[in-house]
Regions:
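Serine-hydrolase-like catalytic core of hydrolytic proteins
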Residues: 1-127
């Protein structure tokens, strides 16, 4: 499971709130003899550095919405290397609240859905 934190796309970080503490999820996944989960939190650029867009930026060779690219790269990294820390790169669920939930929805629909995604489940909360 990977988590994308919220914060209105302008604030936050992977360890910056109590909702980011995975201990309850991990304990619940091990209850009753369950094998548990691997929990990975990611960071991404925020504010103007993460979400600038427009024709002037693109004409100057800039990348619009770099925060989404940061997230996509991190998700792809988790899928590629999950096996190195006991996970299954073919069984990734994204969890996110607020801007994190919205980001999950953006990842699903990015590129008109033509590029696909490297995760198999999504839990967008209050996007």
């Amino acid at each position: 499971m990977s988590r994308i934190y919220g914060g209105g796309y302008v604030e936050g970080w992977k360890g910056g709130d109590t909702q980011g503490n995975p201990s309850g999820l991990i304990k619940a996944s091990q209850a009753g003899g369950g094998e548990g989960i691997i929990f990975v939190q990611i960071n991404y650029r925020l504010g103007a550095m993460g979400w600038l867009s427009g024709p002037t930026l693109e004409a100057a060779g800039g990348v619009s919405n770099a925060g989404l690219y940061d997230q996509r790269l991190a998700i792809e990294w988790v899928a590629k290397y999950a096996h190195l820390f006991g996970g299954d790169g073919k069984n990734i669920t994204l969890l996110g609240e607020s801007a994190g939930g919205g980001s999950i929805m953006h990842q699903i629909t990015a590129f008109g859905g033509q590029k696909g995604v490297t995760f198999q489940g999504a839990i967008p909360q209050s996007p």
